[in-house]
A protein has these predicted regions:
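An alpha-helical support segment within catalytic cores of ATP-dependent transferases
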Residues: 1-26
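Helical subdomain adjoining the active site within ATP-dependent kinase catalytic cores
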Residues: 96-108, 113-147
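Hydrophobic HxD+1 residue recognition
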Residues: 29
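Inter-domain helical "communication" segments and dimerization helices
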Residues: 1-6, 72, 78, 96-103
Length: 147
């Protein structure tokens, strides 16, 4: 990634990845894969599903949601906060996962989502692209909260 701070934080993500409990994850949980009607939501397109660390799908959903109503993945901060709390209260708490550990782990999985686009930008020499710049800025801002 050519950034010492990001590489250090990413190394911590990799360390966590190997120790986090696994579960069935969608692994492409983005708004276009959630159909909502009559107060119910159905998740579709399970082709990338796998047994992965538990925060994988939630991190993808939250990392790519934007508060701009014209954004491809619109999601308010209130929606994100609700999803984070609901996931803990209804799935993790009963399995003995500590809330602070959950939030720390989720933060590193969010970092991964940002770094994925950074690594692709570096690999394909597209570091000047709008997408690279957006996710690089998100990652740099996000690692401040990891300290």
């Amino acid at each position: 990634m050519n950034d010492a701070d990001l590489e250090h934080a990413y190394a911590e993500y990799l360390r966590l990845y190997s120790s986090v409990p696994r579960t069935l994850c969608h692994d492409d949980l983005l708004p276009f894969n959630v159909l909502c009607a009559n107060g119910h939501a159905t998740i579709i397109d399970w082709e990338y599903a796998a047994i992965l660390p538990y925060p994988t799908s939630l991190a993808r959903l939250i990392a790519h949601g934007e508060e701009d109503e014209s954004a491809f993945f619109y999601m308010t901060q209130a929606d994100k906060d609700y999803a984070i709390e609901y996931y803990f209260e209804h799935l993790l708490k009963e399995n003995g996962i500590d809330y602070n550990d959950y939030r720390r782990t989720l933060d590193y999985f969010l970092l991964y989502e940002y770094c994925e686009w950074i690594m692709l930008g570096v690999k394909y020499n597209e570091t000047g692209s709008e997408r690279f710049q957006k996710y690089y800025a998100k990652a740099k801002e996000h690692i401040k909260s990891l300290a």
